[in-house]
From Swiss-Prot:
Pathway this chain belongs to: Nucleotide-sugar biosynthesis; CMP-3-deoxy-D-manno-octulosonate biosynthesis; CMP-3-deoxy-D-manno-octulosonate from 3-deoxy-D-manno-octulosonate and CTP: step 1/1; Bacterial outer membrane biogenesis; lipopolysaccharide biosynthesis
Protein name: 3-deoxy-manno-octulosonate cytidylyltransferase
EC number(s) per entry: 2.7.7.38
Function: Activates KDO (a required 8-carbon sugar) for incorporation into bacterial lipopolysaccharide in Gram-negative bacteria.
Keywords: Cytoplasm, Lipopolysaccharide biosynthesis, Nucleotidyltransferase, Transferase
Known catalytic reactions: 3-deoxy-alpha-D-manno-oct-2-ulosonate + CTP = CMP-3-deoxy-beta-D-manno-octulosonate + diphosphate
Stated family: Belongs to the KdsB family.
One GO BP annotation of this record: lipopolysaccharide biosynthetic process
């Protein structure tokens, strides 16, 4: 298999404030977390895991041949859960890169995962994350995050507001991160920062501490499921692609 020095970890906890038992919600006849895992697994990496605190989630994943790492339900963030899972991977001394894929993107494209792995390995960034160009109308309809970058694509700032102010085209941030191992270790050792707490965005802890995040353009905005309304959109999208035989 390719990229033997890379682990992909999908953090997934059962409890959710906005959508009850979110990972187990159905899209068609298949749960959200199974759809995420199936998409990620198509990237073809041996070290692909779901990190969870839930026997129910674990059962869903193991039934389709996936690997599960159990982590404590008290772990505060997805990145912390990713790191705790990484420490439990057998022979993890051979893993130099860790990709954190959020467990709420049921149609994430495997090509996007492979693209950020290649970009991370061929750059000097601590962390790499995907972005998509979107227009004002598209991003206004989204509750997600935009990013400002410099001419080389290095992230300058992430915000839940539209940045830069006054623009007609924006860079939408996709919730997936490729970490160098030492960068992930450093990140979890740092305390939450002012901007991170203000914007409620973990990646600002990275920038406030002088670490670097490179951005990698991908083509499509994946659907993220955080609310009941998001779930309805995901179900509708699935129904549409099913009719087309995709």
């Amino acid at each position: 298999m390719r990229h033997q020095d890379v682990a992909i970890i999908i953090p997934s906890r059962l409890s959710s404030t906005r959508l009850k038992q979110k990972p187990l919600q159905l899209i068609g006849s298949i749960t959200l977390i199974e759809r995420v895992f199936t998409q990620v697994n198509q990237a073809g990496l041996e070290h692909t895991y779901v990190a969870t605190d839930s026997e129910e989630i674990a059962s869903v994943i193991t039934k389709v041949g996936g690997k599960v790492i159990f982590t404590d339900s008290a772990i505060p963030t997805g990145t912390d859960r990713t790191y705790e899972a990484f420490k439990l991977i057998p022979n993890n001394q051979n893993i130099n890169y860790i990709v954190n894929v959020q467990g709420d993107m049921p149609f994430i494209e495997p090509s996007s995962i492979l693209k950020i792995i290649e970009y991370l390995k061929n750059s000097k960034y601590d962390i790499v994350t995907p972005i998509v160009k979107v227009d004002r109308e598209s991003v206004k309809a989204s509750s997600n995050v935009t990013v400002a970058v410099d001419s080389a694509g290095t992230a300058l700032y992430f915000s839940r507001s539209l940045i830069p102010n006054g623009a007609e085209e924006f860079l939408y941030h996709v919730g997936m991160y490729g970490f160098r191992k030492n960068a992930l270790e450093k990140f979890v050792s740092l305390k939450p920062t002012f901007l991170e707490k203000t914007e409620r965005l973990e990646q600002l802890r990275v920038l406030e501490n002088g670490m670097t995040i490179g951005t990698c353009l991908v083509e499509n905005v994946p659907i993220s499921v955080d609310t009941e309304e998001d779930l309805k959109k995901a179900v509708k999208f699935y129904e549409n692609i099913s009719k087309l035989g995709l």
